[in-house]
Amino acid sequence: LVRSSNEGTTLLHQQADIIRALGIAPSFDAAAETERRVAFLADYLRTTALRAYVLGISGGVDSLTAAMLAQTAVSRLREHGHTAEFVAVRLPYGVQADEADAQKALAAIRPDRTVTIDIKPAADAMLAEVRREAGELFEAARVDFHLGNIKARQRMIAQYALAGAVSGLVIGTDHAAEALMGFFTKFGDGAADILPLSGLTKRRVRAIAKHIGAPQELIDKVPTADLESNAPLRPDEDAYGVTYDEIDDFLEGKAIAELARQRILTMYTASAHKRALPVTPE
């Protein structure tokens, strides 16, 4: 495929615009970024006059990294005389296939408090009621997809209920790679009060995780949203159609294969509504 110089320039400008919009820094130092984000979490909690951070722990590197940053931040606040705690929340849908990884994550985080809430009864009840009242609107082939979104939103309902009980804020785990691909559920895992991993590529999240002492096996774990009951532990990259290395290279301004670039741009455009606030009339 041969492109004109004008078309190539347009694509480079588009890539640069996306990098700027998602806040990816041109350089990265794991130690400096760790400190900056811990300070960010500590300062924000202190200025809100709230007393806790709440975060769902899945067993993946994103929630593990965000949680370790948060636990460090609240510990620092307590050292300076402030009331602060970190509440880790396990939110399995029945029995989680990789529960052992979630427990390893908790052991690494050492949260002030751990709460476990099974979302299966609530998620199943909601799906059943919606299907009972609007079943003809549901394509049979997409029921599992809809249930996956219900799971994500039910998890956020639980986290906000818990945050209200402890005067806390909910932490989200969204980072630049997921934001680029729109790989989150609106008002589910996409809902949060604070995003300590914002502006990071996946490899940079892993670099911070390594710097703060996360278990290597969880750093290297194949990422999965694990929302589909019919495809448990489906890798993120399978859903993307591109690899995290390709996504990260794109976000770091590097050249990637044309098919991968087009896939990324297509998903970025299609998911624009997910990254926007609710639209209003002018």
Model features per residue range: what roles?
Residues 1-55, 61, 65-69, 190, ...:
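Peripheral terminal appendages
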Residues 85, 111, 144-147, 173-241:
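Catalytic subdomain that performs nucleotidyl-dependent activation
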Residues 109, 129-133, 187, 212, ...:
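Alpha-helix boundary/capping residues
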Residues 11-180:
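ATP-dependent adenylation/nucleotidyltransferase module used to activate substrates
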Residues 67, 71, 103, 160, ...:
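Predominant activation on well-ordered alpha-helical scaffold segments within soluble catalytic domains
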Residues 92, 196, 215, 223, ...:
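Proline-rich low-complexity regions
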